[in-house]
From Swiss-Prot:
Protein name from the UniProt record: Phosphoribosyl-ATP pyrophosphatase
InterPro entries the UniProt entry points to: HisE, PRib-ATP_PPHydrolase-like
Protein species of origin: Bordetella avium (strain 197N)
PANTHER family: HISTIDINE BIOSYNTHESIS BIFUNCTIONAL PROTEIN, HISTIDINE BIOSYNTHESIS BIFUNCTIONAL PROTEIN HISIE
Functional pathway: Amino-acid biosynthesis; L-histidine biosynthesis; L-histidine from 5-phospho-alpha-D-ribose 1-diphosphate: step 2/9
Record's subcellular location: Cytoplasm
Name of the gene: hisE
Record carries keyword Plastid: no
Enzyme class label: hydrolase
Amino acid sequence: MTNAPVFGADVLARVADTLETRLPQNGGDPQTSYAAKLLAKGPDAFLKKIGEEATELVMAAKDGRPERIVSETADLWFHCLVTLAHYNLRPEDVLAELARREGLSGLEEKARRPAD
């Protein structure tokens, strides 16, 4: 769908860097930043947005509309990055986990998880 190369890890890291500046303890201003507003409200606010965006992604995928799928995925990922920032995590943590799982079958990976 895109013609230009996008370096995903770089983009994710830059967004994460920006989100860190939006954290309340780093002076994020809820009056001037949507992310700062979500972060100031706390987990209930951004977790609700994750649920909404996930539902919108499901609907876009059911409709088979590639441009909407990409747009809704971007919205979902953004709100996931907000969540990571709140918990002092980085996209690199998620990428490392994906790399760890790479090459494993999903069933094998699931079997290796500790029981809850």
